[in-house]
């Protein structure tokens, strides 16, 4: 879809969720777990080249068959510390608390609500994409927003996380939005413009 960005087919092991590959130097990132197929492994090995990418998990909803994927690739995994206990057998597992910056300058922010350890990843310009996991989900073509689902961990913390995220994003940037949820409601679109971020309901 872009020379630096790749999207994988929906992952049935993640309730139809979406994983992304962002090609940045010196450390590319795989965001959430794609379907673990031979085609996926061939692509990821070719895309990585002689680099060691990092696998970033935006929530427990994006784990899929992560153990099998890491066994094949031997890449380190980064997860918010609240959900590290769900991955006891991984060989290379790093955690963060409130925020984290990768070697490539990608910024992570803890955004609890959808799950206890939900987080987002901001790729600053020139990539200029916000990978928002399940915090923002498709509402319709060109539109992402926050919705309460049966699996939502804490609705009011989710609303607070969305408000905090708005303040955290640098005002001079308007990143495109990449959701980790199922994208069917976007009707063929993949990225959503920043203007398509629908405000959440009031906290009051």
Question: Which residue ranges define each predicted feature?
Answer:
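Short, acidic/polar N-cap/turn motifs at the starts of alpha helices
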Residues: 17-19, 96-98, 118
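Short secondary-structure boundary/capping segments
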Residues: 11-12, 20-21, 99-100, 122, ...
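Short solvent-exposed loop/turn micro-motifs enriched in small/polar/acidic residues
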Residues: 13-15, 93-94, 112-116
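Flexible, charged surface loops at secondary-structure boundaries
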Residues: 1-2, 22-25, 45-51, 71, ...
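Active-site HxH/HxHxD metal-binding segment of metal-dependent hydrolases
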Residues: 34-105, 196, 200
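Zn-dependent metallo-beta-lactamase
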Residues: 1-27, 42, 73, 164, ...
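Metallo-beta-lactamase
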Residues: 28-36, 107-110, 115-204
């Amino acid at each position: 879809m872009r020379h630096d960005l790749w999207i994988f087919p929906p992952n049935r092991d993640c309730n139809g969720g979406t994983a992304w590959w962002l090609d940045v130097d010196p450390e590319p990132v795989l965001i959430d777990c794609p379907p673990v197929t031979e085609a996926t492994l061939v692509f990821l090995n070719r895309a990585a080249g002689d680099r060691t990418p990092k696998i970033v998990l935006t929530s427990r909803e994006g784990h899929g068959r992560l153990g099998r994927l890491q066994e094949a690739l031997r890449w380190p995994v980064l997860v918010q510390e609240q959900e590290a206990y769900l991955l006891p057998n991984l060989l290379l597992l790093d955690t963060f608390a409130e925020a984290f910056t990768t070697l490539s300058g990608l910024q992570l922010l803890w955004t609890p609500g959808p799950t206890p350890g939900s987080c987002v990843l901001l790729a600053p310009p020139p990539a200029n994409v916000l990978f928002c996991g399940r915090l923002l989900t498709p509402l319709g073509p060109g539109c992402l927003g926050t919705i309460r689902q049966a699996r939502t961990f804490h609705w009011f913390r989710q609303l607070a996380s969305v408000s905090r995220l708005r303040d955290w994003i640098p005002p001079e940037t308007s990143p495109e939005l990449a959701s980790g949820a199922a994208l069917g409601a976007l009707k063929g679109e993949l990225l959503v413009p920043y203007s398509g971020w629908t405000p959440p309901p009031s906290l009051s």
